[in-house]
């Protein structure tokens, strides 16, 4: 099959009839811009059934009709025909040549013809189904459609794949099957309704027929069954009474036992409370004693420490005294030896002196007095000299002390200076370190603040990314949902529009007339008028038979239509001929609340139908309710019919019609019109939402990418800041440690300075004290030396006198005196030493007594120390013992608490158990009382049934018997009058019911067959689609590799689990680039990808002929040649007709013709290639 020719007449710029022949292979259509080349493509789309004038670059239907030009009248119609070679029977028509025609008149009426025979648009669409040819197929690629393919939604791309898969016819069959299924469902509902109604009638009559016979049987059965039940129940009740009495005693015993246990538990709990209180008191008492013991132990330990210290001091003092006594013993022994020696020497000298005594007595007396004076002076001088020596020694000691202290003072001063230098140096270091630490700390805080801001920003960005992603996902989901809704609504709208176009829902006669093609038919009344929805019921109730009247131009057209119906035996219908209608308008002048007006005034339509509206609706008044209608009728205020908003009709003669019907045909047509309007608004709104959502999604995607880039930068910045913070933290810790060390050093140095200053002050005080001592000593020495000097003068005088006497008394005297003096001296010495010895003895005795006393003191202190230690140990032992007692008490208290807790649980459980036991006891008492009452009632009932023979009822069947008894009672109570004639009536109804049931089963079987067919079609659709998808996917990858060099192409099914709503996305991956969606490609890349996609489809299923409008416009020369080479490969399977400006395309074409336009009259013409070349050259020069 191929396209032999296109015939265009009055379509757009083709004001004159043109006939364009096409050959096989590649044909190029060329011409200047604006010459009308693309109108040829629009004509092809239009004849194939394009309903959207926007897609063929027109605003409304009249735009496709030639509008005229200079000295050229406008055309009254536009007509396009496709002449197709069908020798291979590619199309399902038994003709070698097929002619497809579409014609539109200036009135807007469309005509479709196949081989010059009138047809319907649906038949043309069905003819081309699954051929790749059609208004939306891939065989007609208009201007910009290449890029539109790339920018198509996944569902639109899926539709292209479906066309290539050849499943459009299957989808159409499925739609048809679904319609059949819907009709079957309607028929099934009707049959079910009649069947249910028949079943109800049958059941009613059946009950009446059986009623009389059943009544007595049921009554007797009821009495016998009742007595048997009563006897069995009585036996059961008496048995239950005995059993429950036993249970009652058991429950009563259980209550007593539980109460006794509860009482014991409560008693024990009270005892535990008392014991715990005693334990607390005992613990408080022990705590009080322990506190006193701790105080006593503390005091004893302090006292012991003092005693030990005193003991050590006494021992040291005793040791010193004992050493001193030994020293005194040695000294006494020496003194005794000296006394003995002096006494011996005295005795020896005394013998000599006796001899000289007489001679010397006189001299002695003289000299005695002088010697006494001398001795006194000598002793005085000696004592004073000794004092001077002692003072000199003291002075020397003081001087030595000064020298030592001055050295120590100098050393302390040097030490203080050194310490001060160290302190100054340390302070400087600390200050510098603190400055550095503060700097590091400020840097650290700054970086931390920077990190916090960065983290906050990062967190904000992450939250934003999450929110944006959610928003994008939500938008994508919403868009998919909107697209699904839009497709569903559009599909539903198209179906409703097709139903409207096909006049579905009208009476058969009306429908056949409308589809007959008879000229002069305007349409059905209901389709040509408009009114507010609230008047629907009123209009339908008032003129139900007129709404499907057909409006025709004149009575001749009406006659033709009636003849058509008569000839075809298609039924009857009414016609409203515009030339015979006589308006019948009644006026209503009264002003009454609730009157909405004449129906003719409430309806809108074309002015040409005003006569029809006045004729049909001029005598009909619409009011709010029936009260207003009857009031107007009674007052004779209106001579026509009156209808209410709820559909009650009051005729002019007083007949009132009302009620509610099921949905009528008219109502369904009303509903369809409303639904079409609603769906149109919904589709427009959904498309707007899809566009708006896509724009928002794109904006959010850009924002998301910006935020992601910023997050990457922030992550790097965060890592850098954290590293800086870690380094600064280490520096700060190091500096802090250094500051702490320096502070410790400073404190240590300060303490050292303080100690050195104290020593310095102490040494200075000692020096000052020593200077004072030296000064006082020197004064004392000076005073003593003056006294010694005076005494020595006196002593010299005395000695001089003695010397004078001694000279006089010679040597004897001297010897006598010397001996005497020696004896005296010896006696003094002996006396002195004896006194010293006595003093030493006394000192020894004194120190011995002290030693004895100290020994006693030591013994007492040691005893005291031992006593104190004993007391401490004793008190500690008591303290520890009482602590153990406290632990024992704590353990006892814990045990009591644990016991109390367990007993509390037991108490709660016992209380609950006791309460439940009491409840059970009370309930069993109630049960026993109820059983007794039941026994009494049963005995009374049995007394009433004495004469009745009782059925034997087993206990296990008692419940079912009672159910049976209740059923019998209900049946008997429901008995009414018995209709004996109902049996025959029931037989007739049963036969009718069986017939309808068989018919219902046949319809159900048909429904199953249709459903199985739909399932089979679905499976076939799925299988063919996926096979096609896989082949085209492979082909697309191959074509991308061949046409776009080293480029990978892939198709991807979105939402594959939902076949009806799934879509297909196109992805490409250029060499050295990431896989990316087509929206990110350049214009040239998009064109090449689209061409690769189209070629991939051709590889799988080439279209018999293909129109391509400037498909290579965005391609360079190389890619254009590549494209033409691919097209050449398909010329054995497909015919290509290209609209082009490209020279390479023209060169590769098998045939070529041109299109030019006469600008004055605006008519396009077909010209030869040579002429079009000349025109193109002229246009190029002019430009």
Swiss-Prot record:
Its main location: cytoplasm. Pfam families: SMC_hinge, SMC_N. It is found in: Cytoplasm. SUPFAM superfamilies: P-loop containing nucleoside triphosphate hydrolases, Smc hinge domain. GO terms for biological process: chromosome condensation; chromosome segregation; DNA replication; sister chromatid cohesion. GO terms for cellular component: chromosome; cytoplasm. InterPro entries: MukB/SMC (IPR050308), P-loop_NTPase (IPR027417), RecF/RecN/SMC_N (IPR003395), SMC (IPR024704), SMC_hinge (IPR010935), SMC_hinge_sf (IPR036277), SMC_prok (IPR011890). GO terms for molecular function: ATP binding; ATP hydrolysis activity; DNA binding. Residues 519-632 form the SMC hinge domain. Transmembrane segments: none annotated. Keywords: ATP-binding, Coiled coil, Cytoplasm, DNA-binding, Nucleotide-binding. Residues 162-483, 666-1019 form a coiled coil. ATP binds at residues 32-39. PANTHER family: CHROMOSOME PARTITION PROTEIN MUKB, DUF4476 DOMAIN-CONTAINING PROTEIN. Contains large globular domains required for ATP hydrolysis at each terminus and a third globular domain forming a flexible SMC hinge near the middle of the molecule. These domains are separated by coiled-coil structures. Homodimer. Belongs to the SMC family. Required for chromosome condensation and partitioning. This is Chromosome partition protein Smc. The gene is smc.
